[in-house]
Every structure is written in C-alpha cells, then in structure tokens.
C-alpha cells in the first residue's frame, strides 16, 4: 500500500509542477520553446528569421492550445549540451527538438517526456573515394560527432563492441561537425539519419 501511495503522490507532484509552468506561461503571455540550433525540416530559421519545421510547428500548436494564437511563442536555439539544463532551470517551458528518449534520461533528469513525434536512427557519411561500404570498415577512422549526444555514446559503444579503434573529433553543434567533415578534418561524420539527409 505504501508503494502505491508514493506513486500517486509523485504523480501529483508532477501535475503540480506542470500547472505551475502553465500558470507562468499564461502570465508571461507566450510559450518559450527550446529548439535545435538549426536542423532542416525540424527547426531552422529562414533568411527572414522565421522558424520552420516540425519541432517549431509543435511549439506553435502548444501556443495555439494555451492562448488560441499560434504566434504567441518564442524560440530559444539550444545545443545538445544546453537542452536539458535550459528546461530544468525554466529558461524554456518546453523542449521540442531532436532528443533521444532513453531510460536513463527518463528516470534521472526529473523531466517528463510526453511522446515521440519522429523515429530516427544513426548513420554515417563518408566520401565515396574512401571506399567504405560498411561502418565495420571505419577501424582507425576519425569521425566528426556532436558532443553530449546519444550519437556520441553509440559511436563509442559500436567501435568498442567491434574491437575497432576510434578517433572521435567532437563539436558543440551538428553544424560544426558537418562543416569540419566538409573541410576534410574527419574521415566520416555521424548523426541521426534525418540530419544526414538535411
């Protein structure tokens, strides 16, 4: 019986926190939404500074639900390193950006994941002249990757599991990692498959 009571109280605390956030949003007059620093199709500011993409549209939908006006939203571009801290500190009200939902994150961050809006997988980009047809052929390769991501962890785990040598070249943003790859600073670039296609 004590266990069930604890779960109910924990649930009540989470509802109270959500109500407190909603009250703060209503008092402020807009939703502060954390988004990716720039990922085509998900969250990217165009040449006029207008944010576009599925993650941005979700932010607009929340604003429409709260205020009846999808324009009552402001965007805070966040790196992978910044995203959870920004949400925990109240810098943003919601986080709508590419974020892998893991059991560790679900249980240790004190945040509520509300659902999945896109399923993705990790991939690699290599130059054709490297002659690589499989990730198993990347032993000893230098790989550009964004730090603080499950992509970085998965990369290390994959190389370790296959007894391969890895030379990670880490960057704060995916844009920086992609640019370094384009400049030839890495043999390969890894991120979500959607990011490779963008």
Could you describe each region identified by the protein language model?
Residues 38, 47-48, 100-101, 127-131, ...:
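Short coil/turn segments
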Residues 71-79, 145, 164-174:
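Short beta-strand-to-loop elements that line the ligand-binding cleft
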Residues 31-32, 68-71, 88-97, 141-144, ...:
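Alpha-to-beta junction loops
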Residues 29-54:
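Short glycine-rich His-centered loop
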């Amino acid at each position: 019986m004590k266990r069930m009571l604890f779960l109910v109280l924990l649930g009540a605390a989470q509802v109270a926190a959500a109500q407190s956030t909603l009250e703060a949003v209503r008092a402020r007059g807009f939703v502060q939404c954390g988004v990716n620093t720039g990922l085509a199709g998900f969250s990217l500011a165009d040449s006029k500074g207008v944010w576009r993409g599925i993650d941005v549209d979700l932010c607009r939908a929340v604003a429409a639900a709260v205020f009846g006006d999808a324009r009552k939203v402001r965007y805070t571009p966040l790196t992978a390193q910044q995203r959870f801290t920004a949400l925990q500190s109240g810098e943003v009200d919601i986080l709508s950006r590419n974020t892998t939902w893991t059991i560790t994150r679900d249980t240790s961050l004190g945040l509520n994941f509300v659902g999945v809006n896109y399923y993705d997988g990790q991939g690699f980009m290599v130059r054709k002249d490297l002659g690589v047809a499989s990730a198993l052929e990347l032993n000893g390769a230098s790989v550009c990757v964004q730090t603080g991501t499950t992509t970085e962890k998965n990369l290390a785990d994959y190389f370790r599991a296959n007894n391969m040598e890895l030379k990670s070249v880490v960057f704060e943003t995916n844009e920086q990692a992609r640019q370094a790859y384009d400049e030839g600073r890495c043999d390969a670039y890894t991120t979500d498959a959607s990011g490779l296609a963008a």
